[in-house]
């Protein structure tokens, strides 16, 4: 199966000093290389402890399902590691994590909400986190990540990289390492890297947070959304993987 459709993966391997390497140290030893997926150690770009991860439900015509095995990730504070291979959400309480491949992330962006920076993601659906819609277009799953108290850095992460902007910057660097490998065969220019964009988009009405029981609660503040929703007046800066149909807000299902 193409890496483009790599799914979220459950893991019990926590990043440690023995199996990771700070990006600055790695570049000092290997300045001409920026990815070590074939080696034993993961490269750590940024990360920290004390984040809340929320699945958003903006479209009433879309049904989202979550594998019960990964539900704790969305119920409590988690640690976050931006690795060269994936974005890792780790539950210290339950001693497991969810690896999010960068190929799975359609869009990652920054938004400012209630005087707080929030990381906004759009993911392609899969077995672990799925979405079905009545629309003719394939749905994306929207996730927000924000800092919570108590919040701190982690010993194996570079100092000062536990902020949401630092998490975003680390993801931007790592995402650029992973080109989509399943672009349309009709295109002659091959695979394309993620492209910097500025999005002036937001949901034009309040969205609902998605509880684990999939019942929506009213949200007090609009949530910035991406390509397949109505737009309003707030702005976010983000980075999006280019689909093979850039002129459409989402890919039409076959």
From Swiss-Prot:
Listed under GO biological process in this entry are: mRNA cis splicing, via spliceosome; spliceosomal snRNP assembly
What are the annotated GO cellular component locations?
cytosol; pICln-Sm protein complex; spliceosomal complex
Domain of life of the organism encoding this protein: Eukaryota
Which Gene3D superfamilies does this chain map to? Pleckstrin-homology domain (PH domain)/Phosphotyrosine-binding domain (PTB)
Q: What is its main location?
A: cytoplasm
Report keywords, A-Z: Cytoplasm, Nucleus
Against Pfam families, the record matches this protein to: Voldacs
Give the family, as the similarity comment puts it: Belongs to the LOT5 family.
Record-given protein name: Protein LOT5
Source organism per entry reads Meyerozyma guilliermondii (strain ATCC 6260 / CBS 566 / DSM 6381 / JCM 1539 / NBRC 10279 / NRRL Y-324) (Yeast)
